[in-house]
Regions:
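Conserved AMP-binding/adenylation subdomain of ANL enzymes
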Residues: 2-18, 26-68, 82
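Short hydrophobic/charged patches on amphipathic alpha-helices used for structural packing
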Residues: 54-58, 85-87, 203, 252
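Gly/Ser/Thr-rich phosphate-binding loop
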Residues: 66-71, 80-151, 164, 173
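AMP-binding/adenylate-forming catalytic core of the ANL superfamily
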Residues: 69, 188, 193-194, 204, ...
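Active-site glycine-centered loops adjacent to acidic/histidine catalytic or metal-binding residues
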Residues: 100, 124, 157, 219, ...
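Conserved ANL (AMP-binding/adenylate-forming) active-site segment centered on the GW(Y/F)…HTG consensus within
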Residues: 116, 148-153, 174, 191-218, ...
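Beta-strand->loop->alpha-helix junctions that form or flank phosphate-binding loops
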Residues: 120-127, 157-159, 268-271
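Conserved ATP/PPi-binding loop(s) of AMP-dependent carboxylate-activating enzymes
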Residues: 155-162, 172-206, 244-246
Length: 285
């Protein structure tokens, strides 16, 4: 319920809003944002059983004048590539929010070009209900006519209301300064009580610091001076080569700069007799 209220404040829903509910409910993003959220807030929702059926999604948005859609980078890519989708089908959408995976820059750009709709990237985990932070539209301050910035390129936005983000050293859990990348701890009412009948795993995931109960996300990132959160990697996605820690995410970023977005790939680490580990790339296409 806490996360539902946080989502409501983010999108600032009104009586005329209609939620496109196409995400699977076995995923926390689909269950909380696309299912429980409209039910709890008394907002109309239009349901599509298969989010990969791009034309069915487009027809549902157009028929019921959906104004808010939650999706993933993978699904948004399908909509940009589908030739059956007329750009006017998404003309009523005022908020398209991406989560569950990193928003591909090309997908964000192509979706805006085709439909005229900006995709706002967010971040979350199942253990935090899941929404932790999100970019939203900038607004004009009515008294002094200054732009209030709520979105930053490359970031996953500002923490939701009542959410505490602590960036700390992965080993000592000492708090780090703004701009320094470290382990992301998440505090707030939306944090889970624990894993079902698994006290040992719960103790590993939940830590209390300075009177705040945090979830250890296992992700690496930093906060800037304005409070925007940027994800840089996952703690588990490092290879130790010859004693040096190599970020798999950084390797992937360099490969993406060369190959572009047409090749789907992922880097992983495997054992190596000489250097301990080595990085290998798995790809398709």
């Amino acid at each position: 319920m806490a996360n539902i209220k946080q989502i409501s404040e983010i999108v600032n829903t009104g009586g005329n809003d209609v939620i496109l509910a196409s995400l699977p409910i076995f995923h926390s993003f689909g269950l909380t944002a696309a299912t429980f959220f409209p039910l709890s807030e008394g907002i109309a929702s239009a349901h599509v059983a298969d989010p990969t059926d791009a034309f069915a999604v487009g027809k549902m948005v157009a028929k019921y004048h959906a104004t808010i859609m939650f999706g993933t980078s993978t699904f948004f890519r399908l909509y940009t590539k589908n030739k059956k989708l007329n750009p006017l089908m998404f003309s009523t959408i005022r908020y398209a929010i991406a989560g569950a995976e990193k928003l591909n820059a090309a997908v964000k750009r192509e979706f805006k070009m085709k439909f005229g709709v900006e995709i706002y990237e967010g971040y979350g985990t199942t253990e935090t209900s899941p929404v932790v932070s999100v970019n939203t539209a900038n607004v004009l301050e009515p008294e002094f006519f200054k732009e209030l910035v709520f979105s930053k390129e490359g970031s996953v936005g500002l923490p939701t209301a009542g959410t505490i983000i602590r960036i700390c050293d992965p080993t000592s859990l000492a708090k780090l300064e703004n701009g320094q990348a470290g382990l992301i701890l998440i505090g707030g009412h939306q944090v889970m009580k624990g894993y079902y009948e698994d006290e040992e795993r719960t103790k590993e995931a939940i830590v209390e610091l300075d009177g705040v109960r945090y979830y250890n996300s296992g992700d690496i990132g930093f906060l800037d001076e304005a409070g925007f959160l940027t994800i840089t990697d996952m703690l588990s996605r490092f290879a130790k080569i010859g004693g040096e820690m190599i970020s798999l995410g950084a390797v992937e970023a360099q490969i993406s700069a060369v190959l572009g977005d047409e090749v789907t790939f992922v880097c992983t680490n495997v054992a190596d007799e000489k250097k301990g580990e080595q990085v290998v790339m798995l790809f398709s296409g």
